[in-house]
C-alpha cells in the first residue's frame, strides 16, 4: 500500500475503465490482470423503502424454524449459507444485541438478526429508507466511517470484497477493502464479534 497516493473521490463511479493514476495500485504494479467486465450496481437495492409489510415478508421467510428445516425458499446464496449464518448467530449468542449489517441489497441477514431480537443497523452506500422501529439504515460515508457508537457484532456477507471498486457508486479506492475492515474494527466493542463471509 502506497501511503503517498492521494485518492480523490471519483463521483462518476462506477467507471468503465480504471483511471490511469490508480492502475498500478489496483493491479499491484501490473501483477494482477485486468478483465473488461463492467457492472453498475447503484440500483441493485431490491426495494428502496423498507416498510413493515416488506420486512415482515423477510421475517417470515427467514424464521429460525424455516432455516433449520430448510424451508426458507430461494435465498440469495442458498440454504447452506443461511443455515451457517444462523448457526453462527446462535452459537456466539448474537441475541438481544446491537448489531450492524454492512452491505445489502435485500434484508435477508437483517431478518435473521431481527428474529433473534437484535436491534439492527444496515450500513450501505445506497441507503434504503427503513420504516421499522428496530431497523435503522445509515450511509457508510456520512455515518459509519465517522461513527462514535460501537456494536456488539457486525455482520457482512459478499460486500467487503467490492469496496473501493466503484460498482455501487462508492468512490474508487484500491485499498477500499482494507479501509472498510479498519472502519468495522473501529465500530466494534472491545469484545465485539465480526461475522464475515464471501461466496
Predicted feature residues:
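Surface-exposed cleft-lining segments at the edges of enzyme active sites
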Residues: 66-73, 162-175
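Residues that mark the start of a beta-strand
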Residues: 97-98, 150
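Class I SAM-dependent methyltransferase SAM/SAH-binding core
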Residues: 100-145
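A short acidic, Gly/Pro-enriched loop at the edge of an enzyme's catalytic core
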Residues: 143-158
Amino acid at each position: 500500500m502506497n501511503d503517498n497516493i492521494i485518492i480523490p473521490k471519483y463521483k462518476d463511479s462506477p467507471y468503465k475503465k480504471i483511471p490511469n493514476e490508480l492502475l498500478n495500485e489496483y493491479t499491484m504494479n501490473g501483477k494482477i490482470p485486468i478483465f473488461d467486465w463492467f457492472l453498475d450496481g447503484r440500483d441493485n437495492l431490491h426495494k428502496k423503502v423498507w416498510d413493515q409489510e416488506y420486512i415482515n415478508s423477510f421475517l417470515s421467510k427467514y424464521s429460525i424454524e424455516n432455516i433449520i428445516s430448510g424451508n426458507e425458499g430461494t435465498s440469495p446464496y442458498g440454504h447452506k449459507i443461511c443455515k451457517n449464518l444462523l448457526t453462527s448467530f446462535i452459537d456466539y449468542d448474537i441475541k438481544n444485541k446491537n448489531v450492524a449489517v454492512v452491505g445489502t441489497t435485500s434484508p435477508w441477514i437483517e431478518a435473521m438478526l431481527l428474529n433473534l431480537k437484535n436491534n439492527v443497523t444496515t450500513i450501505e452506500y445506497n441507503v434504503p429508507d427503513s420504516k421499522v422501529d428496530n431497523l435503522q439504515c445509515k450511509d457508510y460515508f456520512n455515518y459509519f466511517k465517522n461513527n462514535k457508537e460501537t456494536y456488539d457484532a457486525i455482520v457482512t456477507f459478499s460486500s467487503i470484497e467490492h469496496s473501493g471498486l466503484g460498482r455501487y457508486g462508492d468512490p474508487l479506492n484500491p485499498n477500499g477493502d482494507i479501509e472498510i475492515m479498519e472502519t468495522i474494527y473501529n465500530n466494534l466493542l472491545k469484545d465485539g464479534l465480526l461475522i464475515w463471509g464471501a461466496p
